[in-house]
């Protein structure tokens, strides 16, 4: 029984130290928030292998991220069609929808870029 008390006491001290460390880190993070930090400009997306009419050229970084996330999720969940090509390559074909506002913006942006 006395061994359990010792272990519990040591664990309590370690937990207290950990809680103090977390609190200090959170306080420090809160103090530095917004002080002289400029919003980092997102790097311009670059798709060197995409053709001139490729939709990726008119996508915003947020839309690109939504597409990447959707593709990975669909692939991992077994969505779409994944086949082996005669040359040894892998073909992955899937259709998915972005939110309506993104779809409308992409329709307008692609129409303007082709005109």
UniProtKB/Swiss-Prot annotation:
Residues 35-44 have a biased composition (Basic residues). Keywords: Ribonucleoprotein, RNA-binding, Viral nucleoprotein, Virion. The keyword Cell inner membrane does not apply. GO terms for cellular component: ribonucleoprotein complex; viral nucleocapsid. It comes from the Viruses. Residues 12-21 have a biased composition (Low complexity). Residues 1-54 are annotated as: Disordered. Its main location: virion. The keyword Ribonucleoprotein applies. It holds the Pfam family Arteri_nucleo. One of its GO terms (molecular function) is RNA binding. It is found in: Virion. InterPro entries: Arte_nucleocap, Nucleocapsid_C. SUPFAM superfamilies: Nucleocapsid protein dimerization domain. Belongs to the arteriviridae nucleocapsid family. This is Nucleoprotein. It comes from Lactate dehydrogenase-elevating virus (LDV).
């Amino acid at each position: 029984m006395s061994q359990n008390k010792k272990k519990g006491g040591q664990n309590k001290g370690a937990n207290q130290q950990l809680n103090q460390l977390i609190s200090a880190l959170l306080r420090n993070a809160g103090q530095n928030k917004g002080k002289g930090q400029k919003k980092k400009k997102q790097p311009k997306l670059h798709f060197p292998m995409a053709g001139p009419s490729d939709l990726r050229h008119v996508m915003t970084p947020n839309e690109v991220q939504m597409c990447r996330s959707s593709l990975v999720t669909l692939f991992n969940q077994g969505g779409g069609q994944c086949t082996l090509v005669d040359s040894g390559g892998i073909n992955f074909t899937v259709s998915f929808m972005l939110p309506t506002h993104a779809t409308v913006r992409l329709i307008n942006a692609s129409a303007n870029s082709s005109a």
